[in-house]
Amino acid sequence: MSASPEFYRPSPPAFSPSCAAGTSTTEVDEYSCCRTPTPGIREPATCPPAPRKPRPVACRKLLFDPAQQQGKGKAISLRLDELERLFRPITNNANLHLQTNKPTHT
């Protein structure tokens, strides 16, 4: 069931401002018809700066100055024998035991 040729009418041409401007005698701004609007400045005046890594936190070593530490803490003085009692040094017998357990390279 097709339409008979006598009832067929072609569709009218699509309206275009440029076509209308060509047939009109008035001057139409050529930038306003069928164009995507663009900003006046096309390129940035200056480039943005490159991204930078954040700076690492500065390490601050606490320096011990007895003159500044008055009232903040106490300095402890120990004799060598007291220090050895707190932190026992490795004796020669322990060193020999460690050396005998090491595998030998042959």
Curated annotation (Swiss-Prot):
Annotated organism of origin: Oryza sativa subsp. japonica (Rice)
Function field: Probable cyclin-dependent protein kinase (CDK) inhibitor that functions as a repressor of mitosis in the endoreduplication cell cycle. May coordinate biotic and abiotic stress perception and cell cycle progression. Inhibits CDKs activity in vitro.
Subunit annotation: Interacts with CDKA-1 and CYCD5-3.
Superkingdom of source: Eukaryota
Induction record: By cold, drought, propionic acid, chitin oligosaccharide elicitor and flagellin of P.avenae.
Annotated localization: Nucleus
Keyword Nucleus: yes
Gene that specifies this protein: EL2
UniProt keyword terms in alphabetical order: Cell cycle, Nucleus, Protein kinase inhibitor, Stress response
Example GO molecular function: cyclin-dependent protein serine/threonine kinase inhibitor activity
Residues passing through the membrane, by range: none
Signal peptide range: none
GO BP term, example: negative regulation of protein serine/threonine kinase activity
Region entry Disordered, spans: 1-22
Keyword Nucleus: yes
Protein's UniProt name: Cyclin-dependent protein kinase inhibitor EL2
A cellular-component GO term for this protein: nucleus
